[in-house]
């Protein structure tokens, strides 16, 4: 059982490293960073508490929203999904990401107070 799991993981990593464009790898690293930041905030909330509750909610909502926007960007700029997003260039998708991210962070900063 564990040998098959190891072989599946090694094959996944091999194919990911060989066939994924550099642009998507960079975006995946950003997604991992956001995921770890959100997990760290949630762990801190469980261990220490949520005294400044608005601050915790703002940070966590920022992580979740940024993750969702980045996944949307990754889906749109993936070359395998080009047929689904014919009218949207990668530059347009990135501009949409920047605009939505700016709005998200303005709302988050307003929520902090």
Swiss-Prot record:
InterPro entries: DAD/Ost2 (IPR003038). Pathway: Protein modification; protein glycosylation. Residues 52 are lumenal. The modification N-acetylserine is found at residue 2. It is a multi-pass membrane protein. It is found in: Endoplasmic reticulum membrane. It comes from the Eukaryota. Residues 2-30, 74-92 are cytoplasmic. Keywords: Acetylation, Apoptosis, Endoplasmic reticulum, Membrane, Transmembrane, Transmembrane helix. Belongs to the DAD/OST2 family. This is Dolichyl-diphosphooligosaccharide--protein glycosyltransferase subunit DAD1.
